[in-house]
UniProtKB/Swiss-Prot annotation:
Catalyzed reaction equations: acetate + ATP = acetyl phosphate + ADP
Active site, per annotation: D146
Entries under CDD domains matching the protein: ASKHA_NBD_AcK_PK
Gene that specifies this protein: ackA
Keywords: ATP-binding, Cytoplasm, Kinase, Magnesium, Metal-binding, Nucleotide-binding, Transferase
Cofactor dependency: Mg(2+); Mn(2+)
Protein name in UniProt: Acetate kinase
Protein localization: Cytoplasm
Organism for this UniProt entry: Maridesulfovibrio salexigens (strain ATCC 14822 / DSM 2638 / NCIMB 8403 / VKM B-1763) (Desulfovibrio salexigens)
Function of the molecule: Catalyzes the formation of acetyl phosphate from acetate and ATP. Can also catalyze the reverse reaction.
């Protein structure tokens, strides 16, 4: 059985076709710059294929994905009818969706209703679903929400100290993000520990250009760093993370910008990029080696904020079995990991330098063998998690 996983953005479509009998990735890629004069598509099986061509809308992009998947030479299926189901990554489900759900007209409208909570993401998801429904008539489709995993938080963790009617009228609360990734690596970490997930306390650290941290207590999300939107929490590539709320008004008053314009700056021009001009850690590390103080400040600030959240969550959980790093930075940047956890030996948190610098991409611990708190690196696999949820929801 084959399941197609789609993550449609405002101008892109990430896709992956999985063989559910093995869990293997048969083909994957991305369509980018949809709606621009010239777009691009990548397609990877054993080899990688790339091409540039215009994609006026998501429909043209999806058609080309189907063409590649069924191509006589490069394809991995003879006909699109071999695709049994489609799973869609959805960033925000608000309080409407507590778990993955089969898509119908009501669900699609619910995703539209959550657009104010994820204006950069949910509109693209809606277009992706509508396009897939058109091109795959009769194929059952499932929405898997980044926010679902965090719905087990208690009100004391997800409510804000603002008038309660804002929650009643608009659903203003903490929702979190990257839930599919946090869920996947928490389960895989419990396997490493040799403990049932339901008995494991784990701090999951998802570090990519977007980043978040979750406290997982007895297998369920107890708290998470991102808030109403994916802008809150730790310092990210281009996003500010948690700041004094009055900063928005402070900037707006001095720049004569609207609140929306200030939020756009905090989303796209802040974080690491705002401090040192770059959100590429490779560039930042190189500049630090050359003595660049702003690059060092950016890295120090980001790691400082990660340490703050880990410390807070350790106290909230009471007992921490493991801390796990995942996603692009978490999996690939040994300096970042070391900076986040160095000097915490008194709390039972250690890093073995050799293990940290020579991780072989298999799920494993990088802490000292006698460390009270295990530190792991696990490559996230959100696509496989979405595909598994899709199969489970549809009973396939």
């Amino acid at each position: 059985m084959k399941v197609l996983v789609i993550n449609a953005g405002s101008s892109s479509i990430k896709y992956q076709l999985l063989d559910m009998s093995t869990g293997n990735d048969l083909a994957s890629g991305i369509v980018e710059r949809i709606g621009e004069e010239m777009g691009s598509i990548s397609y990877k099986t054993g080899e990688k294929y790339t091409a540039e061509q215009p994609f006026p809308t998501h429909r043209e992009g999806m058609v080309e994905v189907i063409n590649l998947l069924t191509d006589a030479d490069k394809g991995v299926v003879k006909d699109k009818a071999e695709i049994a189901a489609i799973g869609h990554r959805i960033v925000h489900g608000g309080e409407l969706f507590f778990e993955p759900v089969e898509i119908d007209d009501k669900v699609l409208q619910g995703i539209r209703d959550c657009i104010p909570l994820a204006p950069l993401h949910n509109p693209g998801h809606v277009i992706g679903i509508e396009t897939a429904m058109e091109l795959f008539p009769g194929v059952r489709q499932v929405a898997v929400f980044d926010t679902s995993f965090h719905q087990t938080m208690e009100p004391k963790a997800y409510m804000y100290g603002v008038p309660y009617k804002y929650y009643e009228d608009w659903g203003l609360r903490r929702y979190g993000a990257h839930g599919t990734s946090h869920k996947y690596v928490a389960r895989e970490t419990a396997k490493l520990l040799g403990k049932p997930l339901e008995e494991s306390n784990i701090i999951t650290v998802h570090l990519g250009n977007g980043a978040s941290i979750s406290a997982v207590k007895n297998g369920k999300c107890y708290d998470t760093s991102m808030g109403l939107t994916p802008l809150g929490g730790i310092i990210m590539g281009t996003r500010c993370g948690d700041i004094d709320p009055a900063i928005v008004g402070f900037i707006a008053e001095r720049t004569k910008q609207s609140a929306a314009e200030v939020v756009a700056t905090l989303t796209n021009e802040s974080g690491l990029k705002g401090i040192c001009g770059s959100n590429d850690l490779r560039d930042i590390h190189a500049r630090i080696e050359e003595g660049d103080e702003k690059a060092k400040l950016a890295l120090d600030m980001a790691c400082h904020k990660v340490r703050q959240f880990i410390g807070a969550y350790a106290f909230e959980l009471g007992r921490v079995d493991a801390i796990v790093f995942t996603a692009g930075i978490g999996e690939n940047d040994e300096i970042y990991r070391e900076n986040c956890l160095s000097g915490l030996e008194n709390f039972g948190i250690t890093i073995n330098k050799e293990k940290n610098e020579n991780w072989d991409r298999t799920p494993s611990f990088i802490s000292e063998d006698d460390g009270a708190v295990k530190v792991a690196i696990i490559a996230t696999n959100e696509e496989l998690e979405i595909a598994n949820d899709t199969v489970k929801v549809l009973g396939l």
